[in-house]
């Protein structure tokens, strides 16, 4: 199995992933150079015209090794978020990488665009990571967080890996790792530095 390194500029971080195919979902006219670009609009650089809120996507299960969601999730209708993330999971191969960048949910960058309807903050990705109280609400397909960064006046970026069902022993370990994550930050405010160092 051949692998390559992918540099995520927003995080100044390198990830090891399998070679292509890689998907740039909602690429607009700014498709990543090494990706297959998908968008609901026919723009320069778009390889496949498809509305990604229309699920399923025209791809086989586990047909790509990486998905980029660069400033797309904030445009996805909130009630479709779980189905959308589950579709990303379906299309990615096991241990595939999902990189999601979005304006921080309470920032001017989020609210300035009249089409932004789905705000994400630093706790939102944990709804997709087994082993914490937020995941237990909807129990979607399972991911693990490899990197999480954010600035409250800028963007949030998260790199997630597709995982399969975890064992009860592993879930206990994960729950211990994420024990500080609570719905609505009931106990203490989220600390930006803490969130950066533990993933």
Q: How should these model regions be labeled?
A:
Residues 9-10, 27-28, 111, 124:
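A broad, low-specificity signal for short, low-complexity segments enriched in glycine/proline
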Residues 8-9, 68, 131-132:
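Hydrophobic, well-ordered secondary-structure scaffolds
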Residues 20-106:
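Conserved SAM-binding loop
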Residues 2-20:
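Conserved alpha-helix/loop element of class I SAM-dependent methyltransferases that forms part
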Residues 79-83, 87-199:
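S-adenosyl-L-methionine-dependent methyltransferase catalytic module, highlighting the catalytic core
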């Amino acid at each position: 199995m051949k692998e390559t390194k992918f540099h995520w500029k927003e995080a100044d971080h390198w990830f090891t992933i399998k070679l292509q195919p890689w998907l740039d979902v909602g690429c607009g006219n700014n498709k990543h150079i090494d990706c297959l670009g998908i968008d609901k609009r026919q723009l320069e650089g778009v390889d496949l015209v498809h509305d990604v809120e229309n699920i399923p996507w025209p791809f086989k299960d586990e047909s790509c090794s990486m998905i980029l969601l660069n400033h797309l999730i904030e445009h996805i209708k909130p009630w479709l978020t779980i189905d959308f993330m589950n579709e990303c999971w379906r299309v990615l191969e096991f241990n595939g990488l999902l990189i999601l960048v979005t304006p921080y949910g309470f920032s001017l960058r989020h609210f300035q665009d009249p089409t932004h309807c789905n705000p994400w903050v630093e706790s939102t990705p944990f709804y997709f990571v087994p082993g914490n109280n937020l995941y237990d609400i909807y129990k979607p397909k399972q991911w693990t967080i490899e990197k999480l960064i954010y600035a409250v006046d800028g963007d949030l970026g998260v790199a997630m890996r597709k995982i399969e069902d975890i064992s009860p022993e592993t879930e206990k370990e994960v729950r211990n790792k994420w024990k500080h994550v609570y719905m609505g930050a009931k106990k203490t405010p989220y600390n930006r530095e803490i969130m950066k160092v533990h993933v």
